[in-house]
Structure formats: structure tokens, C-alpha cells
Amino acid sequence: MNLHEYQAKQLFADYGLPVSKGFACESAQEAMSAADSIGGSQWVVKAQVHAGGRGKAGGVKLVSSKEEIKAFAEKWLGHNLVTYQTDEKGQPVNKILVESCTDIDQELYLGAVMDRGTRRIVFMASTEGGVEIEKVAEETPEKILKAVIDPLVGAQPYQARELAFALGLNSDQVKQFTKIFLGLAKLFQDLDLALLEVNPLVITKGGNLHCLDAKVVVDGNALYRQPRIRDMHDPSQEDPREAHAAKWELNYVALEGNIGCMVNGAGLAMGTMDIVKLHGGAPANFLDVGGGATKERVTEAFKIILSDDNVKAVLVNIFGGIVRCDLIADGIIGAVEEVGVKIPVVVRLEGNNAELGAKKLADSGLNIIAAESLTHAAEAVVKAAEGK
């Protein structure tokens, strides 16, 4: 689960990390009042969305008057911000962050991620702050420093000092960096994070370290024991179909094609998308109904798929193991009748009672094509989507 920048900075502040004084505002008047509370003659205003690239898209601005703050708020609040990380519709801006201006002398990068390869929290630091760290990793990987955290002993001060010395920090800055490093490590572990980034971690003209930006991603599987973090969830930043799917424990990701896919099992779902692509089609979604492909879940899955106006045909690919294919076929037939599916539906059943399931589909009288194999299913659904 992603957090907004202002939420991440609240967590940083709770752990004693240096962040700018700021307020998340929902109106232009509130934003101007925030500037008065902060004081000073310059402020930074930032549109709050779950996406990077805000600065290039005009969603971050340095302002010198309350009139500029008002204009920025009126421009973005209630509107969508489109960045290179969003789709063409962008994401809605419901709040803007108004915060104090910071004098910057140098920009660094500091982040942490749960590395599945080592099964450890891995911290990364670089002198190349303020830019996309992915580009740094690709073009100059030697500029990324790493520290692997042993889960038995936790983050250690010496690891912070090693990174700080490699970044070229002076003695006072090494102490500050160590405090930030240990604070972030504790935050990461306490709150079950999957990723955090401070980009940039700046050195001010006064020589102090300051967390100018904050990105936090929480492990969704751990939200049951993180009630405070769970309450920070902003559903407006999610695709409505994905949010609806989550309520039914369906794994759904919207894509840009015209062939809806409904599959049981994530691996089979990815393979299904691959073979559709191989035969010239374009998947409209990833949808894993899981092991319990009941009529109710299949019905909801159809509703979600058909809510996408781009979908011209649907491919259902089910492997029957414990759940018999004839029962799955009953569920598909019932779902198609209940939802009133008007577009072609291609179904491939394999496994327990697959032949009986295919016969039920063929005898249903509905616009359902029973495929004999996965290749046949892919060919059939691509032709159906093309109107052939």
C-alpha cells in the first residue's frame, strides 16, 4: 500500500527524522493559512498523488506569495495530475502539501527495500540524489552503495558510518546520517514496510542533513497488524475496478488491451496473457480468481472485466484441481446469464471433469466457445475480439 508524501513525513517526524514543517491542505484558503503558520517568504507546494514525476508535470512548485499558493491550489485541487508513472487519465489531487523552503547545497539518495533474493532489508545510498535512482542503477551502478541488514541484530551504527564516509560526509554529518539511518531502519521494521525512499536527502547550506522528500510503501499483507497505517489508505488513488476486486479477494490489474482474462492462479494468468499476446491479441487485464472459482466470485469477476468499455471478448482459463470443472462450468454459465454478457466468451477448462464441463458449456445455448486447448483458446479469443 502506498502512502502520500505528507503521510510518510508524519511517520518520519514521529521517528525523530528531520523533515520540513508543512501542512496537507484541501482548499486554497487552507493552503494560504498554512503559509502563515509556517512563516517565511518562500514555500514549496506539492500535489499529493501516488506517483513519481510530479515536478516535471507541474505538480511541485516553489512560490513566493500567497497569491501563487492560491493559484496552484485552484489549478490542481479537484483535478487529475498526469505523470510518466500514471495512465493517460492521471490521478486525482485531493490535497496539496505546503511546506517551508529549504536551502540546498547538495542532494543525496537514501532508500531501503525488502530484497527477496537475500531475504534481508537492504539500504541503498548514493551521491546522485534528486534524480531517478533506476537510471543511476542502470547507467552508473558503481555509484550505488549498499548495506544489508541482518535480521538477528538489526541495523548497526557502523553500517551507517561506512555509508556516510563513502558519501564524503564530514564528522558532524556522519553523526546526523547515522541517526537518520537507524531511525529509518526502525521505522521500516516497526511498520512492516516494503520500500522507503528519501530522494533527495539534502545537505543544506548550513551543512545539515534534511529529508526533503519521502516515499513509503507498506507491505499489504501486514496491514492487519498496522491499524494506524491501514487508516491512511486513500482509495481515490486506486483504479476503482482494482479496489472492487480487492473486496472479493480477486487479484486484478487493469491493462490497455481489449481481451478480458479470467484465470485461476497467478502463474497460469501470466502464461495466459503471454499466449494471447503471442497470437496477436492484447490483454485488457490480469485477473486471478484464486483457488475458489465459485459462481459468486466468477460473477463479480465478469462485472469487473465488463466495466472496461475496451473489452471486446473474454478468455476464461481454468485448471480444475480440487474444484471440479463441471462445477466451474455451472458457475460460468450462471455468471454469464446473471451479468448478461453480450460479447464472446471463450472458455478453456483442463483437469478434474474437464470434458463434462466443456459439454455443459456447449449445451448452454449461450455465446460461449469451449476451447479444446490453450492455443485454441488464444486463437479463438483473438479472432472474436477482432469481430471475425
UniProtKB/Swiss-Prot annotation:
GO MF annotations, alphabetized: ATP binding; magnesium ion binding; succinate-CoA ligase (ADP-forming) activity; succinate-CoA ligase (GDP-forming) activity
Single GO cellular component term: cytosol
Catalytic activity annotation: succinate + ATP + CoA = succinyl-CoA + ADP + phosphate; GTP + succinate + CoA = succinyl-CoA + GDP + phosphate
Domain of life: Bacteria
Listed pathway(s): Carbohydrate metabolism; tricarboxylic acid cycle; succinate from succinyl-CoA (ligase route): step 1/1
Essential cofactor(s): Mg(2+)
Keyword Ligase applies: yes
Annotated positions binding ATP: K46, G53, R54, G55, E99, T102, E107
Keywords: ATP-binding, Ligase, Magnesium, Metal-binding, Nucleotide-binding, Tricarboxylic acid cycle
EC numbers for this chain: 6.2.1.5
Binding site for Mg(2+): N199, D213
Family classification: Belongs to the succinate/malate CoA ligase beta subunit family.
Quaternary state and interactors: Heterotetramer of two alpha and two beta subunits.
Protein name: Succinate--CoA ligase [ADP-forming] subunit beta
Native source organism of the sequence: Hahella chejuensis (strain KCTC 2396)
Gene: sucC
